[in-house]
A protein has these predicted regions:
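N-terminal amphipathic alpha-helix/helix-capping segment at the start of soluble metabolic enzymes
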Residues: 1, 86-159, 403-406, 464-470
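Short, acidic/polar
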Residues: 152-164, 209, 227, 250, ...
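Glycine-rich, proline-tolerant flexible connector loops at the mouths of alpha/beta enzymes
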Residues: 169-197
Length: 470
């Protein structure tokens, strides 16, 4: 297959090295590869016959008309020339996209394939039992249970529950503190009665447990003090239970639950936080004759570290321990996003089932770090100057000063009582420039920096402080 690789002078050597072993012509069409025009490509295709063209993934032009005229398919290559070596071996084995850069396209294809494998494995899995249609145990994927603490105090419980399910929770657990009443429990579950998704109640109070049995699918925290009181009621309701150890052992409490007639039992050996017996508590996660519950959320909430790595590692430990349900929460600001992170982590563990390590799976939990850094070609220049320090004196823009902030998922820039809002920093800056609100170049540079900081704060769920460090 003969390939045409139009490129720029800045990346020519890199592309030539990558294409050396292929039947490919590397042609420089200008200084920058992404500036290739349909006319320039049309002229190249008139000179020689090719089976396909791979243009820079950064090209913004449409080559649809050129393809119609010449019959030669024009595909998007990677956005970065350094990645062309990863794409060329695939030519002829699969069709690249005409509109999406090859690196994005291939990553999406791998992710789609990975998610299909997860879906197929879940479809074929034979569970220990079902909870409102959700498979628990057996060979099914480890299910994510997300907690809402003090559910009776939640302002919009329905939206919160729906949001948790949308984020990836298989089960939403409604916790009720010591100040909750049976009426509180009844009210909360009545607001969710028509939701066709698994809900759990988390309380040790027998009266609160009874109040939840009309809708709850799982009861958490049964042990020797409440099983004698509500065990038969729970059994009659046909709901599943999570049994924990108390003053007696977990094994004895499971036996108590069985004696009461409960059939769907999940064992929770109680995972302890780091520093309070975490390693020792892992020894309790032995093989049980029933599904096992892994309380990862308690560990993450009590660890001042980014949640994404902690959730990934705990999901791996839970998978090795044979857990069927993994608990997570978003109670604190630092754990926001844990539901989505934990769902992805459980999917990674499914894909890692037949591998020695959970890597190169098609999906990952890399957020800030890269799996592999690109080795870009060095910049070419003939002269350089050392940057001078920015002067301490500030020249105020005569048009006025801005206050930058964030509201939900939007960036807000305010001047003279008028706000411009947007989701992308460049859109906000462009609007401010178009309105004539900025007259000094250094003010524009400053605003670009602050607006981008605001966008990053939204993306990563962080606080934003104008003029502060990110």
């Amino acid at each position: 297959m003969r390939i045409l690789l139009p490129t720029g002078a800045a990346t020519e050597s890199l592309v030539r090295r990558a294409a050396a072993e292929y039947d490919a012509d590397v042609v420089v069409t200008g200084e920058i590869a992404s500036f290739l025009t349909p006319h320039a490509l049309r002229m190249l295709l008139k000179k020689k016959k090719y089976d396909c063209v791979i243009v820079s993934g950064m090209c913004t032009a449409s080559f649809e008309q050129v393809e119609r005229e010449t019959g030669v398919p024009v595909y998007r290559g990677p956005r970065h020339a350094a990645d062309i070596a990863l794409v060329l071996p695939l030519i002829g084995t699969m069709e690249l996209s005409r509109t999406v850069p090859a690196d994005d396209f291939l990553a999406a294809r791998k992710a789609e394939s990975a998610l299909r494998r997860i879906e197929e494995q879940e479809k074929d899995a034979i569970p220990d039992f079902l909870i409102r249609g959700v498979k628990i145990g057996g060979g099914s994927r480890m299910k994510v249970l997300a907690e809402i603490m003090d559910a009776h105090r939640c302002g919009d419980i329905r939206s919160t529950v729906e949001g948790y399910h949308a984020s990836g929770a298989d089960i939403v657990d409604l916790g009720f503190g010591f100040d909750a009443t049976p009426d509180d429990v009844t009210r909360v579950f009545s607001l969710l009665a028509d939701l066709d998704a698994p809900l759990a109640v988390d309380t040790q109070d027998p009266s609160l447990i009874r109040a939840a049995l009309g809708r709850a699918d799982i009861v958490l925290s049964l042990q020797e003090t409440n099983i004698p009181e509500v065990g038969k009621d729970v059994a009659m309701a046909g709901v599943a239970v999570v049994v924990v150890p108390g003053n007696t052992t977990l094994t004895k409490n499971i036996a108590l639950a069985k004696k009461a007639g409960v059939r769907c039992i999940i064992a929770d050996p109680l995972l302890q936080p780091v520093g309070s017996g975490f390693t020792r508590s892992l020894s309790g996660f032995r093989k049980f004759s029933c599904p096992v519950f892994f309380g990862a959320g308690n560990v993450v909430e009590l660890l001042d570290a980014d949640s994404v790595g902690a959730n990934a590692l705990l999901a791996g430990i839970a998978a090795e321990a044979g857990a069927s349900i993994i608990f997570t929460s978003e109670h604190s600001d630092k754990t926001r996003g844990s539901i989505r992170e934990m769902r992805r982590a459980t999917e990674m563990m499914v894909l890692a089932g037949n591998r020695p390590y959970p890597k190169d799976l098609g999906i990952d939990l890399l957020v800030l770090k890269e799996k592999r850094r690109r080795r870009e070609p060095p910049l070419e220049y003939t002269a350089s100057a050392t940057a001078r320090p920015m002067p301490d004196e500030i020249t105020c823009d005569p048009r006025g000063n801005f206050r930058i902030g964030i509201e939900g998922d939007r960036i807000v820039a305010v001047i003279h009582g008028k706000a411009v809002t947007g989701k992308r920093w460049q859109d906000v800056l462009y609007t401010l420039l178009s309105q004539g609100d900025i007259s000094l170049p250094d003010h524009a540079g400053y605003l670009g920096r602050e607006l981008y900081k605001a966008e990053l704060a939204i993306r990563y769920g962080r606080s934003f402080e104008q003029d502060g460090e990110f």
